[in-house]
Amino acid sequence: MADRELTQPDRQLLAAVARLAGVDRVRVMDETLHGESRSTFAVAAGDDEFVVKLVPGAQRAINNQRRLVRLVRELRRRGYPAPEYVGVGESGGTIFTVQRRLPGQTLHAGPGMPPAPELFAAVLPSLLAAIELQRDAGDLAQPPWPAWLLRTIETGGDGYCLHATMRQAPRTAALLDRLQTLARRSRRDEVTTRDVVHFDMNPANILHAGGRLTGVVDWNIPFDGAGQGDRGFDVATLLFYTYDIEQTREALWERALELSGLAWTTVYLCHLSLRQVEWSRRHSPSSADDARFMAIAEAVLHDCAAQGA
């Protein structure tokens, strides 16, 4: 699920972006996009601003991104604060999407840092209401959820959730063993599969203006069948990434349990613990980011067990 690393866009790609956006030409904006993956860049055409996201893969990637555009358009029709997608394009083997840029700034204070507690508390009610609009918005009769999610816990993922990273140190190895044990005994009860799932609903992908929610960005369907499952996973994601904000922790726990129950909320938090701890340990070992997410993961797993998981 690793994103394509962005290099300087070439003229051919920019011309294709302009055609898709219905303008004569676009210029690359000289800024780093916060709240989007490293495979994105912003362009301007007159007074209009767009976000271009590069997507790895070939024809199948095009089909998945077209499906993404359909899903997000349906969410917007329901009133969801998602970006307006102009469409999906291809240039020289590069697949890309173009969306209109939403106003606002990201919730997080910086990479790996939590949002200000008062700010997050102000935005949270609107964010939970938005997630509720994902209910029954999926388009697949038999989505692969949660089988692929469970595989990340058992064997690892494609470019993320790497178990080899976790086995390199006693503390992370113990965390992996613990979350696997918790997840295995929590794989019970019926699971929701009909909702749209963002899958990375962390503060870096949430926009606000003065404490008012303005958008949820960085939508993606990286493989066949992704983007559909249990919307409670997105609530669990918010819970994990803001676990050190006491002001909102209880409300997020309550909503996660209402949607998914303790068993599946535990499975989701086990995956999130693995995903973020492994990523931080591999990319920024011994950093404040690494330390913060390790502490959150240990606290999350402790609290899951304390509730009876």
Where are these regions (language model features)?
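Anionic group-transfer/hydrolysis microenvironments
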Residues: 55, 102, 202, 220, ...
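Active-site Asp-x-Gly
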Residues: 194-196, 207-252
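ATP-binding pocket architecture of kinase catalytic cores
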Residues: 30-141
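An alpha-helical support segment within catalytic cores of ATP-dependent transferases
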Residues: 6-24, 132-199, 293, 297-301, ...
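Active-site activation/catalytic loop segments of kinase-like enzymes and analogous catalytic loops
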Residues: 231-261, 270-288, 298-299
